[in-house]
């Protein structure tokens, strides 16, 4: 019985491998038929966005303001809009301040709520 099972399994495997190998022939022409090159980003390498190549989003600040550009858009010309690094630093500072507000065990200090 074991021998029969092994023989059946082997036949199935051999058939499958032969089919796959036959179907795989010429698959290297795929790149020539379609586009000829693998995926690449549309605008070349990812770089920090400058004011010139973005529209109303003002310098890619939406990555840090969770979808709303209003923080960077306060000054409409966006000349002084914070860079991503500055925004990150401000976030860190906020986080540190919030951490200071927490007392033992992560419970917020009572003084913050009842001055």
UniProtKB/Swiss-Prot annotation:
Basic and acidic residues: compositionally biased ranges: 46-55, 91-115
GO cellular component, as recorded: extracellular region; host cell cytoplasm
Keywords: Host cytoplasm, Secreted, Signal
Principal location listed in the UniProt entry: secreted
Gene null: resulting phenotype: Leads to a slight decrease in lesion numbers and lesion sizes after host leaves infection.
Species, as recorded: Pyricularia oryzae (strain 70-15 / ATCC MYA-4617 / FGSC 8958) (Rice blast fungus)
Name of the protein: Biotrophy-associated secreted protein 1
Signal peptide limits: 1-22
Induction comment from the UniProt entry of this chain: Expression is highly up-regulated in invasive hyphae.
Described function: Secreted effector involved in biotrophic colonization of plant cells. Induces an early, basal defense response in susceptible rice, including rapid callose deposition and ROS production in leaves and calli. Also promotes sporulation and mycelia growth suggesting a role across the whole process of interaction, from the biotrophic phase to sporulation.
Phylogenetic lineage: Eukaryota, Fungi, Dikarya, Ascomycota, Pezizomycotina
Top-level taxonomic group: Eukaryota
Region Disordered, annotated ranges: 24-115
């Amino acid at each position: 019985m074991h021998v029969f099972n092994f023989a059946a399994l082997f036949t199935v495997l051999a058939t499958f491998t032969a089919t796959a190998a036959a179907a795989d022939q010429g698959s290297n022409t795929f790149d020539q038929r379609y586009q000829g090159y693998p995926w690449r980003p549309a605008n070349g390498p990812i770089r920090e966005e400058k004011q010139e190549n973005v529209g109303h989003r003002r310098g890619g600040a939406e990555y840090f303001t969770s979808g709303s550009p209003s923080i960077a858009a306060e000054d409409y010309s966006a000349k002084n809009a914070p860079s991503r690094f500055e925004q990150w630093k401000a976030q860190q500072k906020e986080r540190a301040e919030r951490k200071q507000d927490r007392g033992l065990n992560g419970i917020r200090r009572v003084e913050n709520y009842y001055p």
